[in-house]
Amino acid sequence: MIELDGVAKTFDGGVSALQDVSFSVPTGSICALLGHNGAGKTTTIGILSTLLMPTAGRAVVAGHDVVREPDRVRASIGVTGQDASVDIMLTGRENLVLFGRLRGLRRKQARIRADELIEQFDMTHAADRTVLTYSGGMRRRIDIAASLVVPPAVLFLDEPTTGLDPRSRRDVWALVSSLSAQDVTVLLTTQYLEEADVLSDSVVILNAGRVVADGTAEELKSRTGFVYCQVSPVDPADLSGIAAALADFRGLEVDRDMNTVSVPADRGVATLGEVFRRLDDRNIDLTDIALRRPSLDEVFLHLTEPPVTA
């Protein structure tokens, strides 16, 4: 379990990175920590992994206070950063054995554990090749596997799929999802909103060092409160006609790439009926008309402000 209560962090020079951050992650669940660059995600991970000291507040990881019991916290966690921590000149197997030895396993235990992880992570075919020859997806696999050599109670994943192709990203998703079945608590930061939607049991959104939303992805979508009516014409040439017919709707959006027109549906089904009537009067044929809730991407944009640039 992870708990933060009123955590703040101010760096030298008075730069405030976190302000009154509070949230919790139950044992065996996956929480996605979202925010723009500079929102405080990496600082939060740094505090929870004892790399940084909080200026105020309390943080508990796996039952241990990060300030009073840092050694116990470190013994309970695994951390995978944005850059791979493995030695690219060693084989995958050699890396896992090395990490096992560094974590206190005897040589035989380290070899046995390495073999278990190689099989679990489907790396048998590449285990005895140097990591230098691995694809980006394979490097992320071996990196995550290394953080699990001694099974942690809590695993921190800092943007685990950045730079990966879609197939490799989904492979990593499958690996991360399997961890909750092993009662591992996972806190991950990510720039990919789809990733958070697919993987997470809960989502925490940071903006300028503060928590602006905390809940499941579905709860956040519902809490945002807006629903829109989206239509798709049979003939893309009708997009302009649809826009003209619905011109009095505030917030109308035309997406020519997706062949859709969307308007806010403040009255729900009544709005959908009004849209359908207007387009029917103009003899515009549709392939689809529906009420839709916002995506997690739209929720994120709604709740956060762009970072201030100099």
Language-model regions, residue ranges each:
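Non-catalytic surface loops within mature trypsin-like serine protease
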Residues: 13, 27, 125, 235-236, ...
